[in-house]
Amino acid sequence: MSTDVTQLAMALIARPSVTPLDEGCQTLMGKHLSAAGFTLEPMVFEDTTNLWARRGTQAPVFCFAGHTDVVPIGDLARWHTPPFEPTIIDGYLHGRGAADMKGSLAAMLVATERFVAKHPHHNGSIAYLITSDEEGPFINGTTRVIDTLEARNEKITWALVGEPSSTYKLGDVVKNGRRGSLTGNLTVNGVQGHVAYPHLADNPIHKAAPALTELAQMHWDNGNEFFPPTSFQIANINGGTGASNVIPGNLEVMFNFRYSTEVTADELIARVLGILDAHGLDYDISWVFNGLPFLTGDGPLLEATKSAIREVTGYDTDPQTTGGTSDGRFIAPTGAQVIELGPVNATIHKVNECVKIADLEQLALCYEKLLEKLLC
C-alpha cells in the first residue's frame, strides 16, 4: 500500500511542470505547509513561479530548498509508462521528476508534517524555498528569491537542497559543495574565401586550433582535499558554410570551466585572454558566470546530516563536491551552510525516470531526523 510520501510524490509527478512551468505543484505544497502553520509568500518573476514559506520568526532558520520544474520528457515512444502518469512497478515509482526532484519534495513535506506534529514549539524556524526555474535558465528562480530575502536581511542558517545526490543507494553520497561554473563564448574572426585561393582568405579554424589545443592541455590547478582540479571542456564548435570549397569567415567556440576554490573566475579569464592574445587571434568573447564554488565544511549541518543518514540507513555517507551545479550556489554566498541530500540519480533526465519507493520513505526519515537534531 502506498505511503503518504508516495501518494504525495505521485500527485506532484502528475502535474506536467516542464520548466519553467509549475502547473500547480507549489499550490499543492502550499496547502500542506499552510496546514502545518507556515506563512506563504508566493514570488512570481516573469515566467517563473517561486514560493517562500516560513514557520517561525526566530533564528536559526532551517530551509528546505528545491524545484518543481522538470526537464522535457524526450522521446515519448521510449517511455515504458506515460511520463506524467505516475506508475508503481516492482517497488519503483516511475514518472518524469520522480527522482529529480518531486520525490524529495514529497519527503520534505511529510518529514515537516511529522516533525511539527511532534514538536509544535520547536526552536528557530523552518522555511521552504521552492522554484520552477532550476532546470531552465535559472534567472528568475532561487537567485531572485535570495535577492529579495537579502534586501530585507532575512537569513537562512542551514539549507537542505533535495537534489538527487545518491549514487548507488540512498544517502551513500551527499554534496557538501559544488564547483564553480564559467562559460566562455568565443568568436574567432577570419576572412572568408575560396579554398583554392587561401592567400586571399584568412582561415579562423587554422588560426584558432593551436590556441584551443593549448587551452585543452593547460593544467589550471591541482584542486585540493575537497575539489578535483579545475576542468576545461570545449562544448561546441561551429564554423563554415557547409560547402567544401569555402574557407569560413569565423569560428564559434563555446567552452566551460568547472573550477575549484583554488582559482577565481577572474584568474581563469585572464589566463584565457593571455593565451588567445599570445596566438595573435582576432576575436570577440563573452562570459557567463553560472555560479561560484562553495563548500560546507565540518559544522552543525554536515554533522547532523551524517548522523541522520547513519541512524536511518546503518552506513556512513560520503560528502563530495563532484557533479553539476545546483541552486545551492545561490544560497551559499549568503553565509548559509548548504548540503544536498536526495535519491539515487541513476535515471535523472533520462526516459523512464524512476525512484525506489523504499528510498523515499527513508529519505523522509532522514529529513525528519535532521530537523530534530538542529531544531530541538
Curated annotation (Swiss-Prot):
Keywords: Amino-acid biosynthesis, Cobalt, Diaminopimelate biosynthesis, Hydrolase, Lysine biosynthesis, Metal-binding, Zinc. Coiled coil: none annotated. The active site is at D69, E134. One of its GO terms (molecular function) is cobalt ion binding. The keyword Ion transport does not apply. The keyword Metal-binding applies. Zn(2+) 1 binds at H67, D100, E163. Binds 2 Zn(2+) or Co(2+) ions per subunit. Its cofactor is Zn(2+); Co(2+). Its EC number is 3.5.1.18. It holds the Pfam family M20_dimer. Zn(2+) 2 binds at D100, E135, H349. PANTHER family: ACETYLORNITHINE DEACETYLASE, N-ACETYL-L-CITRULLINE DEACETYLASE. Belongs to the peptidase M20A family. DapE subfamily. This is Succinyl-diaminopimelate desuccinylase. It comes from Shewanella denitrificans (strain OS217 / ATCC BAA-1090 / DSM 15013).
